[in-house]
Amino acid sequence: MSFNTFGHLFRVTTFGESHGVAIGCVVDGCPPLIPLTEADIQGDLDRRRPGQSRFTTQRQEADQVKILSGVMVHPETGVQVTTGTPIALLIENTDQRSKDYSDIQNKFRPGHADFTYEAKYGIRDYRGGGRSSARETASRVAAGAIARKVIAGMTVRGALVQIGPHKIDRDKWDWDEIGNNPFFCPDKDKAAFYADYLDGIRKSGSSIGAVVEIVAEGVPAGLGAPIYAKLDGDLAAALMSINAVKGVEIGDGFASAELTGEQNADEMRTGNHGPAFLSNHAGGILGGISTGQPVVARFAVKPTSSILTPRKTVDRTGHDTEILTKGRHDPCVGIRAVPVGEAMVACVLADHLLRHRGQVGG
């Protein structure tokens, strides 16, 4: 299997399977002399960690990260810093229950990657989905914690803005509420509604989709390049690579199709530090290059297909059958996708920052 690496100068390679011994990543291209400890990474991993509420999978993983290479204690300052060499990170799997999947080893789960992996490789890891499992995203979050160090001065934050058909009230958006509920929801009232709503979904054995919004502030103007190296193009690819993501938009996205030119164009006036934009329909990117405004992206997460309702499918021999998925699964995978989306945006920004410096300096 190829294509386990993304990025150009800030490159991330992830490895491992859901029910394997461990997962992890190698981050290549991180500049030297950046202070970095396991604690710097652990905080982000803890936000994504499963089993923290009844609204996520009950798989219990500590997700304790180990830095295997790429850092050392600076001989003069006594601070552990990056050396500029590849940074290898390891996260052990400790709560696999492969027996929960024995009944489906010869059946394709509808809506999962079972059939397509089998069609391409002639084999698939049925134990929790292998590489196609959301378990893989812990490695991305670990890499994203390093990327945040590279883009010091920029802030990348995410929020759950919709579950099923139910959207938050944007007039009630409060970033301080994100850590006060299990949904990463910025709307206090909607978070309470989501709790009741997801309880019903969970108890019925079903699942539901969601929309996540990522906002990056402090992004300088000039990141990205025209045509084939657009910042928004790389962001879209990075976010689309997350498990279960089926749609990505930048700025107003698909809603811009309903606007006139007068409504959509972000007008400008002279400000204290250069041009000041009067709106941000473009999501902080024009012509593939950042404008200096907040970079805004949203992605849609489909409902997981691992549900307790029997579904029609076929087996590996081509016979019709039914399947009932056992195991522990998220009723709404969009919840834990929030820190994953933040990590992917941070990695893309780190990559583009280094590419920008390499091309034009600064």
UniProtKB/Swiss-Prot annotation:
**Top-level taxonomic group:** Bacteria
> Record's GO cellular component, any one?
cytosol
Q: Where does NADP(+) bind?
A: 48, 54
Here the disulfide bonds are none
Q: In which pathway does it act?
A: Metabolic intermediate biosynthesis; chorismate biosynthesis; chorismate from D-erythrose 4-phosphate and phosphoenolpyruvate: step 7/7
Report quaternary structure and partners: Homotetramer.
User: What's the protein here called?
Assistant: Chorismate synthase
Q: Which organism is it from?
A: Rhodopseudomonas palustris (strain ATCC BAA-98 / CGA009)
Q: What taxonomic ancestry is recorded?
A: Bacteria, Pseudomonadati, Pseudomonadota, Alphaproteobacteria, Hyphomicrobiales
